[in-house]
């Protein structure tokens, strides 16, 4: 090898990627992992301070504070991102809220339900619709919806969260049918119980967020339409052969 030869940087495996819920947990880990692979990231989250801290860790991460519960602002958000970063080609809907409460708990109000439904379900639908014309104009693009094993069977203390993830899973399937034959891939990333601030104090045997992020990206690069991560890889078989067992396992997850 010529000692004076300058090694050319490898091309990024993915185009610029939007990651929602990037302030902490899986979203933060996704942003860092993607950036480490050379993928530019638009990191969206509500906590501007945490986002700036994240962006300071890698030059390829751009912090974009936004509250996705403000559904009426999502169209403008998508337009602003595309205007600033016209090379955006991947949208990962990771943001999520779970109130670990029963429906009859006195502290669980209508505003909590509205927030959960908006962030977990309505925002991904609205953001996808707003960004879709741009994505369809690219040679290759991808929408990734981060769902959960709870989309298959509900958790006792997370009725609304389980319902939103089931809705997001069905939306993923419907969108995939709509976009079949187009340049836009639609991917369902099914998560197990992951160690994040949202799951603090709940359950055992949680998958580290970094491992969850790496598995998601590996599945995405492998071209998979459904990525079952960690213990969630057992969900399809259990749902088919032992649905009662799966339901009992997830009720107290």
Question: Where do the protein language model's features map onto the residues?
Answer:
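Residue(s) in the substrate-gating loop at a strand-loop-helix junction
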Residues: 148
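Conserved glycine-rich Rossmann-like NAD(P)H-binding loop of the short-chain dehydrogenase/reductase
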Residues: 37-53
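C-terminal helical subdomain
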Residues: 188, 200-240, 244
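Rossmann-fold cofactor-recognition segment
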Residues: 58-72
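Conserved mid-core segment of classical short-chain dehydrogenase/reductases
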Residues: 98-114, 157
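Active-site helix of classical SDR
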Residues: 128, 164
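Conserved glycine-rich cofactor-binding loop
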Residues: 23-24
